[in-house]
Amino acid sequence: MLSIDKNSFKRDYNNKFVQLHGKELKEGNNQQKYEALGSLVRDYVISTWMETNKKYNQTGEKQVYYFSMEFLLGRLLGDFLLNLGIRDICKEALRELNIDLEEIENLEHDQGLGNGGLGRLAACFLDSMASLNIAGHGCGIRYKYGFFEQKIVDCQQVEASDNWLREGNVWEIKKQDKAEIVKFGGTILTDYVNNKLTFTHVNYEPVLAVPYDTPVVGYENEVVNTLRLWSAEPVSNEFDFSSFSRGDFLKAISYKNSVEAISLVLYPEDSFYEGKMLRLKQQYFFVSAGIQSIVRHYKKHNGDIQLLDEKIAIHINDTHPTLAIPELMRILLDEEGLSWENAWRITQNTISYTNHTILAEALEKWPIDMFKGLLPRIYMIIEEINERYCEELWNKYVGQWDKISRMSIIGDGYVRMANLAIVGSHSVNGVAKLHTEILKKKEMSDFYYLYPSKFNNKTNGITHRRWLLRSNPKLTQLLIDTIGESFIKHPTDLENFANQLDDKTVLKRLGEIKKENKERLANEIYRSKKISIDTNSIFDVQIKRIHAYKRQTLNCLRIMDLYNKLVENPNLDIIPRTFIFAGKAAPGYYLAKNTIELICRVAETINNDKRVNDKIKVVMLDNYQVSLAEKIIPAADLSEQISTTTKEASGTSNMKFMMNGAITIATLDGANIEIKDEVGEDNIIIFGLNAEEVLNYHKNGGYSSWDVCNKDIRLQRVANDLINGKYCRDRDRFRSIYENLLTYNDEFFVLKDFNSYLEAQEKVNYLYKDTDKWQRMCGVNIAHSGIFSSDRTIKEYATGIWGSTVIYKNL
C-alpha cells in the first residue's frame, strides 16, 4: 500500500503536469490532466516494480510466464489507484483542484487487446498473480490496433479501427535494449561438428521484436509484476533512401510495412492464404521473442540450463502459443547444445496448456507447406517430435492405424496445434468441471487414456477487485458494513453475507443499490442511444461475443414471441422488461453479424410501437468492451447464460453477474453447473437440454428442427416473422438465420430449447414480483460468489500445475 497524504499528492500532481505540458494546471484540458495523472501513478509504481524484480532475482523464486494472444485489460488507472490504496486520497485531492476523477478516468482508452473471455481471463489472472505475491508475468503482442471499434449503423455492425494508441499509452515502458530477433523463412543447413549434427539457419527474414512492459500492480502488497507485449519492427530502422531516390517507392516501404503488419491488428481475417500466413507469423513472433527473452534472463540470474524447468513455468493460454514447445526445443538443442532427451524433458516439464474450447473451428491446424516455408527449423523439430511420439503410439496401439492417425501431430496435410500442445506439455487443463469431463471422455479421450495424469480441471475465475470493488463501490460498502473487510483479501469470506439475509434492512439496501446502478446505466443508454428506459423494469442482460452457440438468437426469438403476445393482449400480466444486448461479431462471421441486425431491427420495431413500449424495450449497445461491462453488470437483474449445453467451456460473465447480485437464467453448461451447485437450485433458473441429451443427439441423431417447429404455433409464427417482412422490408434479410434453424437442422438446438426457455422466463416474472424473495436470491448469489474469484483459480494453478507455492504476506 502506498503511503501518501493528500497535500503531497496535490504537490506531486501539479509538478507532474507542469513537467509534462510546460504550463500551469489551470490552463490544461482534461486529456492533459489524464496524462499527468497516469504518468504520476506510474511513477509511484516504478520503484516498487524495480524492487519486486530485484527480489525475484535474488531469491530465485520460480517464475511463471503466461503466454496469451489476448490480454483484454480495459482501463488501468482505476485498477492502479485501488490496488495502491490511494483512490480516496486521489479523488479528494483532485476535487480540491476542481477535477472530477471519474471524468478523467473515462478519458482512458480501453486496452482492447482481446476479443472476449480468453483475453479478459488472462487479465484477471495477471491481477491475481500479483495480488497473491506470485512471480507471474504476461507475454503477448502489442497490437497497434485493438480487435475493432464497433459501430451500429442502420442496424448493422460496422468495423472501424480501434486506434487505442492514438493518445499514447502512459503505462508502458519501451525496452529497446531487450529486443530479440525472430527469424522467418530461409533455409536450414545441416552439418556434423565433433560428431554432432548441427543446424544453421540462413537466408532468413529477420524481424526485430521490441518489448513494451506494463506494470501489473498487486492489491496493497508492494508487488508489481510485468506484462510484456512485443511489437514488430524492421531490424534496421534506417530508411532505404537509395531505393526511394531511384523512384522505387514501393520497395522502400514494402519491407517495413510487411514487418509492422505482424503486430498491427488482433486476429487478421484468415479466410485467405495471406491472412492465415499472417496469423501464423504472429503466433511464432511473440512466442519466439518471449522464449528467447526468458532463457536469456534465466541464464543471467541462474546457472545450469539443465535446471530451467525447476525455475521457470511457461503456461500457454489456448493453442495460439503452442509454438512455445518447438521454440524452446530449438533453443535448447541448437543454441544450448543439449541432447534431444534432455531438451524434451525440460520442455515438457516447463510447459503447461489450458484448453478453452471443444469447437472444431477453434482447434487450430496449419497447412504443412505454409508452415514448412515460414518456419523451416520449427517444422523439422515438430517432425521429429511427431516421429518419436508416433513410435510410442505404434508400440502401444499395434495395428490401430485410425487411432494413430487421429492422434498424430502431423496428418492430412496439416500441423495440429492441440495435439502438439498435449504431447509437449506436462499438464492439460479444462476450465470448468463439465468442460474437462467432455475433454477427457469425448473430445480428447484418446489422449486422456494415453496420458491420464496430464488432465485436470481448473475452473475459471474473475478478479473481484475489478468486478466488485471497482465496478460496484456501493455494494462493496454494504458488504464492508455488514461483514467487514476480510472478503477483500479472502473472497470466500463473502459467504458470511448469507447470515445477513434475514435482515430486511439489508435486503432493502440491496434493492436500493441495484436501483441506483440501473439509473446510472439508464443515463448511459440515453446518452449513447437516445432511448429512455424504465428503471423499474427487469434489466434482462446478455452481453458477450456474438456466436451461434451462445444463442443470442434464442433470446431474440423469445422477445419476438413476447411482442406477438403483447400485441394480441396488451393487458398481459408481465413485469416490464428492458432487454439489453452488447457484443461484437467477428468481421468475417456473416451469421453473427446478421444476428446483430436482427436484434436491432426487432429493437427498432418494438421501441417505436406505442402499444407495447411501456412494457418492453430492446437495446443493443455499441462497442462492447471492459469499461462498458463495468457499467452494465452492476445494473443487471437477470443474467442470460444460455449457450447450448456442452459448447461453452466455462464462461466468466456468469460469475461477474452473480457477484453483483444478478440472478442467472442458464443451461447446464460450463461453470453454470458449478454456480448452481454453490447457490442451490432455488437461487438459479435452469432450462434446456442437459449434456447427456445433447451428446446423444450428436452421436445418434434423431433431432428434427422442422418437427419441433411444426408442433409449436409460437415457433411457427416467429420463424415466419424472420422472412415475412415484419422486421425488414427485405424478406430475405434474415433468411440465413431462418435456414440455419430449419433447413440446416438447428445445430445449436435453439428450437428444441425454446419452450423450456419460455417456461423459465415465466418463472422469472413470477419470482420478481416477490421483492423480498428476489433480493434474498440476489444476496445468496453474492454470498456464494467468492469461490469464483480468480485468486482461487490461480492458487490452484500455482500449487497444482506450476509448482509455485510462494504466497506471502497480507493473505
What is each stretch, according to the model?
Residues 1-811:
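A conserved ligand/cofactor-binding region detector
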